[in-house]
Amino acid sequence: MSRVGNRVLVVPAGVTVDISASNFVSVTGKLGKLERAFSPKVKITLQDNTLTTQRLNEEKATKQLHGTTNALLANMLKGVSEGFQINLEIKGVGYKAELKGNKLVVAAGYSHLVTLDIPSNVEVKVPKPVEISVKGIDKQAVGAFAAVVREIRKPNPYSGKGISYKGEKIRRKEGKTASK
């Protein structure tokens, strides 16, 4: 029994949801529009500003899709009404980031600058050279781009230098000790 799939999703004010016969869902809100095709094994219904999902059979794959479909719909509703934001912080001497047009340029201790193209559905801001803010309405796109930025230089467990999510607890290790 999927507890996530049985959640009733309340459609926020100012958000419209359109469901086609082929389970193609379009969600429009003040921040934009998201569209996604869902499996026909899960029935999506809209009644009185609430979205519900129901499985059409009890197969294992359908049970797995039930909770996933409900979670994806919840993320779509939140994305078009509030949006998603991930903040990253850069630690290290000489490590910094800047925006140049539609590109994010990161100096992360390499012999060269790392340049990333910013996707069209993601907005990136650099309030300080050591802070990066990734915003957007699509949770998957925001998380994927933030992960790509973090992958440039993961936090070092010995020194703590690198790019990490804001508030991320980095597991620190002790260095080598001198022998006696």
From Swiss-Prot:
Residue ranges of the region described as Disordered: 158-180
Source taxon at top rank: Bacteria
Keyword tags: Ribonucleoprotein, Ribosomal protein, RNA-binding, rRNA-binding
Gene3D superfamilies for the chain: Ribosomal protein L6, alpha-beta domain
UniProt GO MF annotations: rRNA binding; structural constituent of ribosome
GO cellular component: cytosolic large ribosomal subunit
Keyword Nucleus recorded: no
TM annotation in the entry: none
Keyword check for rRNA-binding: yes
Family statement: Belongs to the universal ribosomal protein uL6 family.
PANTHER family per UniProt: 60S/50S RIBOSOMAL PROTEIN L6/L9, LARGE RIBOSOMAL SUBUNIT PROTEIN UL6M
Subunit (UniProt): Part of the 50S ribosomal subunit.
Record HAMAP family: Ribosomal_uL6_B
Task performed by this protein: This protein binds to the 23S rRNA, and is important in its secondary structure. It is located near the subunit interface in the base of the L7/L12 stalk, and near the tRNA binding site of the peptidyltransferase center.
Name of the molecule in the record: Large ribosomal subunit protein uL6
